[in-house]
């Protein structure tokens, strides 16, 4: 049974109903419709915390989806799951892949910055200031890109850039 039929959340049900209506009325190929169905089911599983099921759906959606913009969001969500699972190297890979297809995803730049900042903090705890500085510099670059795309957002990152004298 498709996940959209078993989810009890009101918002998810509403989204599923609207998505099903749109799938019927918007002229798209069967492959595009199938890709969207997997993407929708992946989002539903992800919101329930069922990451293994979400990944299966997202991987199938990436296999079917041909539009680069739509693929960027699928890849971004895969990155989110890997981030949640502590698989930061994989997460960075998927955020990069998402940005290759859609360079206007400030949330991907932000998440990459958070991972780099975290790795910098780990390096400080391990006493490796050179590596910490490199990770922090990389975090700064990603945060600058996120802020450039959405100037009113990422206030904490903006403040960190100022405090660490990395903001130009």
UniProtKB/Swiss-Prot annotation:
Cystine crosslinks: none
Region forming the signal peptide: none
UniProt cross-references to SUPFAM superfamilies, sorted A to Z: TPR-like
Gene Ontology biological process terms from the UniProt entry: photosynthesis
Localization (cell): Plastid, Chloroplast thylakoid membrane
Main subcellular localisation: plastid
Pfam families per the UniProt record, alphabetical: TPR_1
Keyword set, alphabetical order: Chloroplast, Membrane, Photosynthesis, Plastid, Repeat, Thylakoid, TPR repeat
SMART domains associated with the record: TPR
Membrane topology field: Peripheral membrane protein
TPR repeats: 35-68, 72-105, 120-153
GO annotations of cellular component type: chloroplast thylakoid membrane
Function (record text): Essential for the assembly of the photosystem I (PSI) complex. May act as a chaperone-like factor to guide the assembly of the PSI subunits.
Family: Belongs to the Ycf3 family.
Name recorded for this polypeptide: Photosystem I assembly protein Ycf3
């Amino acid at each position: 049974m498709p996940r959209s039929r078993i989810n009890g959340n009101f918002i998810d049900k509403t989204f599923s109903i609207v998505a099903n209506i749109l799938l019927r009325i918007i002229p798209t190929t069967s492959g595009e419709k199938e890709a969207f169905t997997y993407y929708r089911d992946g989002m539903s599983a992800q919101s329930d915390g069922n990451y293994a099921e979400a990944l299966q759906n997202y991987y199938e959606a990436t296999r079917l989806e041909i539009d680069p913009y739509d693929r960027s969001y699928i890849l971004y969500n895969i990155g989110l799951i890997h981030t949640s699972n502590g698989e930061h190297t994989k997460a960075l890979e998927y955020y990069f892949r998402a940005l290759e297809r859609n360079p206007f995803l400030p949330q991907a730049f932000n998440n990459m910055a958070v991972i780099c900042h975290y790795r910098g903090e780990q390096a400080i705890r391990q006493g490796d200031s050179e590596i910490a500085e490199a990770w922090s510099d990389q975090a700064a670059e990603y945060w600058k890109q996120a802020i450039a795309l959405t100037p009113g957002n990422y206030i904490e990152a903006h403040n960190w850039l100022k405090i660490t004298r990395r903001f130009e």
